[in-house]
From Swiss-Prot:
Record's subunit section: Homodimer. Component of the ankyrin-1 complex in the erythrocyte, composed of ANK1, RHCE, RHAG, SLC4A1, EPB42, GYPA, GYPB and AQP1. Interacts with SLC4A1; a GYPA monomer is bound at each end of the SLC4A1 dimer forming a heterotetramer.
Protein's UniProt name: Glycophorin-A
Region feature (Disordered): 1-55, 101-144
Subcellular location: Membrane
PROSITE patterns (alphabetical): GLYCOPHORIN_A
InterPro entries, per the entry: Glycophorin (IPR001195), Glycophorin_CS (IPR018938), GYPA_B (IPR049535)
The protein's role, per its UniProt record: Component of the ankyrin-1 complex, a multiprotein complex involved in the stability and shape of the erythrocyte membrane. Glycophorin A is the major intrinsic membrane protein of the erythrocyte. The N-terminal glycosylated segment, which lies outside the erythrocyte membrane, has MN blood group receptors. Appears to be important for the function of SLC4A1 and is required for high activity of SLC4A1. May be involved in translocation of SLC4A1 to the plasma membrane.
Residues that span the membrane, as ranges: 70-92
Native source species: Macaca fuscata fuscata
Compositionally biased tracts (Polar residues): 1-25, 33-48
C-alpha cells in the first residue's frame, strides 16, 4: 500500500539553493536541491507556479472578517434590498403626492361656457369692453 506524505517547501530569503521534498505514489521520497537564484523579496513555489511577494511595510494588511461568507452575502443582499426599497418607496410617495395635487386643481370649463375663446368669436362689443377692463393693466384703464 502506498502512503502519501504532504510536500514540504523550505526556502531561504537570501540568495542560495532551495530544497524541495516531494512525495511520490511509490513511497520513494526524494530530496532535490535546485540552485535557484532568487532575490531577497521573491519566493517561487514549484507546486503552484506563482511568484509570491511578502507584504512590504507600505502595503495594507488584509482584514480578517469575523463573519462567514453566508453572513456577508446576506448583509450585502440586505443593503441592496434596503436601497431598492427606499427608491421604490420614494417613487410611490411622489406619485401619490402628484395625484393628490392634480385633484386639487380646478378642471377647465367646458368649451360651451359663456367665456369667449378668442376676439373673433365675440358677438357683443360692449361685453368685450367690460372683459378687457379686467385684463388690461392698471395704466391703460386709467388713461381711457
Amino acid at each position: 500500500s502506498s502512503t502519501t506524505v504532504p510536500a514540504t517547501h523550505t526556502s531561504s530569503s537570501s540568495l542560495g539553493p532551495e530544497q524541495y521534498v516531494s512525495s511520490q505514489s511509490n513511497d520513494k521520497h526524494t530530496s532535490d536541491s535546485h540552485p535557484t537564484p532568487t532575490s531577497a523579496h521573491e519566493v517561487t513555489t514549484e507546486f503552484s507556479g506563482r511568484t509570491h511577494y511578502p507584504p512590504e511595510e507600505d502595503d495594507r494588511v488584509q482584514l480578517v472578517h469575523e463573519f462567514s461568507e453566508l453572513v456577508i452575502a446576506l448583509i450585502i443582499f440586505g443593503v441592496m434590498a434596503g436601497v431598492i426599497g427606499t427608491i421604490l418607496f420614494i417613487s410611490y410617495g411622489s406619485r401619490r403626492l402628484i395625484k393628490k395635487s392634480e385633484s386639487d386643481v380646478q378642471p377647465l370649463p367646458p368649451p360651451d361656457a359663456e367665456v369667449p375663446l378668442s376676439s373673433v368669436e365675440i358677438e357683443d362689443p360692449e361685453e368685450t369692453d367690460e372683459l378687457n377692463s379686467f385684463t388690461k393693466p392698471n395704466q391703460e384703464r386709467n388713461e381711457s
